[in-house]
A protein has these predicted regions:
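Eukaryote-biased RCC1-like beta-propeller repeat architecture
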Residues: 1-4, 8-234
Length: 234
């Protein structure tokens, strides 16, 4: 299928190779020209991310591509420059080796990627999958989740309890969320308006479990609020 990009472009976020606005959809040819097939897309306030597979005859590697505003390291390239065309993210930590990206979400100025690889099933992990969550860019409110409140220009692993297998992720403007296979919801980042659901208005710099009375199925986030689908009792 064809990728369409439109609306505002002040820092290359549309990926067309210029800084011109578009007032109607325009095909983004970068991936077609390289025989790459997008399968996951995400958009932040001023940056864009696509996960692609390589088709037969591909002339560029598969994986994660990002472009747009680079301030705070939004693009995960190890630098803070804007990019007006898609850039392959190659700055992963060693634990990413063998991983396959299955999900992504972008916040106002930060990025989350969920990746997995197959492992032998066990009592603690009957799903037979190991999943890692990676985050990068602006961390001033703790939204990266690595127990610090500093920016990260490269993907950094976010650690949840070992028994948890993340199923879905979401980003608000400055907070992050993850739903696990056990039905647990974890939240971190900016909490000034109660968007973390933790009963107060404090920021969190690492994942913290929300209300254990519900089995969460899906989560979504707005600028300063959170929406979830849940069963009443586990």
């Amino acid at each position: 299928g064809q990728r369409q990009m439109c609306i505002r472009d002040r820092d290359g976020r549309l990926g067309h190779g210029d800084y011109e606005d578009r007032d109607e959809p325009e095909r983004l040819v970068f991936f077609d020209e390289r025989k790459l097939a997008p399968r996951i897309i995400a958009a932040g306030d001023a940056h864009s991310l696509v996960v692609v597979d390589a088709a037969v005859g591909a002339t560029a590697p598969e994986g994660v591509y990002a472009w747009g505003r680079g301030a705070h390291g939004r693009l995960g390239l190890g630098r803070t420059l804007n990019k007006k065309t898609p850039q392959h993210v190659e700055t992963w930590p060693s634990c990413y080796k063998g991983m396959h990206v299955i999900g992504a979400a972008l916040g106002g100025a930060h990025s989350l990627v969920l990746a997995e690889k197959a492992i032998p099933a066990s009592g603690a992990n009957p799903w037979g999958r190991q999943r890692h969550l990676y985050a990068w860019a602006y961390g001033g409110n703790g939204q990266i989740g690595d127990e610090c409140m500093t920016d990260r220009a490269r993907p950094t692993r976010v650690k949840l309890p070992r028994q948890e297998v993340v199923q879905q992720v979401a980003c608000g403007k400055a907070h992050s969320l993850a739903v696990t296979a056990h039905g647990d919801l974890y939240a971190w980042g900016k909490g000034w308006r109660g968007e973390l659901g933790l009963g107060d208005d404090r920021n969190r710099c690492g994942p913290e479990k929300v209300d254990g009375k519900h089995q969460f199925l899906k989560v979504a986030a707005g600028d300063r609020h959170t929406l979830a689908i849940a069963l009443k009792h586990k």
